[in-house]
């Protein structure tokens, strides 16, 4: 039954995305938005004044960033009462007229972030107002990857781990070169401990998909990594998800995903 549901979802995604975007089209979209949207343009220009300090935490090199233009996001009140009082800035109806959306998957749009942490910062919100809950949209990540520039990485801040809009689901994306965890991954993996491996048969073209779960010891915080040679990594992720602690007052484990 689960395989039938997965097959139907994939068919829906194929139908919706017969004409997919390419990495070049996404870069052109960013360029056009920065040309016509003054707020995004000015805040991107301010990144030249960005201050970055290199330091070590538990022997791990860390970059600390000082970006005054991000003060609104980093100090945003995310308690239930505050969220209910403000209009959701990720809902299309509340976004400024200059902000445009690029249709990328069945449930997700792509937008330029007007308060970037680095140049080319993208926000990828759900088309419907639904809370941060990554299992709901995990199956669409693979299709999303295929439309982004090849040097981009997708990341996710959980509703209790830094998301400034926990009431509206969204991924984010930036160039991999700005993410120390990714640039340091090969070195970090040397301390990886295998936890589980899963094989799934996809179809006669793709064949068998292998996904492996690792625990990496030696990072500044607990770190799990999943490596997969196909799109079928979400089952292993959900098994990990089920083992992570969740507070009785919260709906998702405290996690960030890259």
Residue ranges and their predicted role:
Residues 142-145:
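Short, well-ordered alpha-helical packing segments
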């Amino acid at each position: 039954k689960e395989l039938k549901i997965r097959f139907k979802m994939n068919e829906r995604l194929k139908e919706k995305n017969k004409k997919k975007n390419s990495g070049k089209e996404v870069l052109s979209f960013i360029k056009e938005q920065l040309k016509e949207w003054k707020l995004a343009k000015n805040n991107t220009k301010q990144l030249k004044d960005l201050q970055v300090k290199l330091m070590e935490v538990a022997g791990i090199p860390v970059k600390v960033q000082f970006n005054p233009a991000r003060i609104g996001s980093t100090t945003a009140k995310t308690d239930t009462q505050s969220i209910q009082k403000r209009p959701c800035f990720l809902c299309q109806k509340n976004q400024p007229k200059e902000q445009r959306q690029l249709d990328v998957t069945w449930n997700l749009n792509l937008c330029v972030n007007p308060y970037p942490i680095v140049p080319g910062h993208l926000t990828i919100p759900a088309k419907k107002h639904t809370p941060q809950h990554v299992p709901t949209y995990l199956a669409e990540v693979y299709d999303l990857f295929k439309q982004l520039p090849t040097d981009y990485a997708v990341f996710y801040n959980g509703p209790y781990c830094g998301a400034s809009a926990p009431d509206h689901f969204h991924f984010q994306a930036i160039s991999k070169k700005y993410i120390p965890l990714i640039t340091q991954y090969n070195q970090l993996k040397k301390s990886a401990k295998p936890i589980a491996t899963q094989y799934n048969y996809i179809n006669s073209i793709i064949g068998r998909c292998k996904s492996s779960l690792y625990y990496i010891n030696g990072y500044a915080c607990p770190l799990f990594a999943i490596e997969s040679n196909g799109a079928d990594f979400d089952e292993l992720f959900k098994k990990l998800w089920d083992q992570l602690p969740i507070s009785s007052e919260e709906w998702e484990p405290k996690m960030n995903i890259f």
